[in-house]
């Protein structure tokens, strides 16, 4: 039983289709990335690059719109089409740069992410994953070349409740990471700083 199941299970209410999925990036976690969800239910209150970018270009209209994630319903079909073209170019495919592959409490997003990672691994490509949600124990059954990470901004869960209201509690993130680590998976933690003086941070 995955840890997030102790909380409420949330439902995806929006779906979109895309023409492409995989693209080249300079992000430090991989040389290619994919974003199979638009938006992020974690709703971070400090400046979020992904939210600001998507709002600027009209992909979302408001913070509330951003916090109601839209799942790319043709994710697996796009991977079937694109992986043969990219498989000899990709060193590491990162999930995800502008969203979270394991949004806290979203079964449907979790299942799509697991299916995508399996499909990517079956093509001989390893993945890196970064989340503020819960890394599911099912990842243990996928390639041990994959790299699984969590983001932590503060160990104060009161801060998390104020500034990352939809994200997983810190102890649950760490506990899930420990399960994968003890099962022999490659694991890591990203520590992010924040600016206390920022207007959005109060």
Model segments located where?
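Conserved Radical SAM active-site core
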Residues: 3-41, 45-149, 153-158
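Short, solvent-exposed loop/turn segments at secondary-structure boundaries
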Residues: 105-108, 162-164, 199-201
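Surface-exposed alpha-helical segments enriched in charged/polar residues
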Residues: 84, 118, 175-178, 182
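Charged helix-capping and loop-helix junction motifs
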Residues: 109-112, 171, 201-202
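N-terminal amphipathic/basic-hydrophobic helices that include classical n-h-c signal peptides
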Residues: 1-2, 188
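Short, surface-exposed, charged loop/turn segments at secondary-structure junctions
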Residues: 143-146, 163-167
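Active-site glycine-rich loop that binds ribose-phosphate moieties when present
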Residues: 169-175
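Conserved strand-turn element in the central/C-terminal portion of the radical SAM core barrel
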Residues: 166, 178-200
């Amino acid at each position: 039983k995955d840890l997030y199941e102790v909380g409420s299970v949330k439902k995806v209410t929006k779906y979109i289709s895309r023409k492409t999925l995989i693209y080249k990036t300079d992000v430090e976690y991989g040389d290619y990335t994919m974003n199979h969800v638009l938006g992020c239910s974690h709703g971070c209150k400090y400046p979020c690059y992904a939210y600001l970018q998507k709002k600027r270009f009209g992909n979302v209209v408001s913070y509330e719109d951003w916090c109601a994630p839209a799942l790319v319903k043709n994710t697996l079909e796009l991977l079937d089409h694109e992986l043969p073209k990219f498989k000899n170019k990709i060193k590491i495919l990162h999930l995800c740069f502008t969203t979270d592959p394991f949004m806290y409490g979203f079964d449907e997003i979790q299942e799509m992410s697991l299916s995508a990672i399996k499909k990517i691994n079956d093509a001989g490509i390893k993945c890196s994953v970064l989340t503020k949600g819960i890394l599911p124990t099912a990842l243990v059954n996928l390639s041990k070349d994959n790299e699984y990470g969590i983001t932590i901004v503060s160990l104060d869960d009161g801060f998390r409740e104020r500034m990352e209201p939809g994200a997983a509690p810190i102890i649950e993130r760490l506990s899930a990471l420990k399960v994968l680590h003890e099962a022999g998976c490659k694991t890591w933690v990203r520590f992010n700083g924040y600016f206390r003086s920022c207007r959005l941070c109060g």
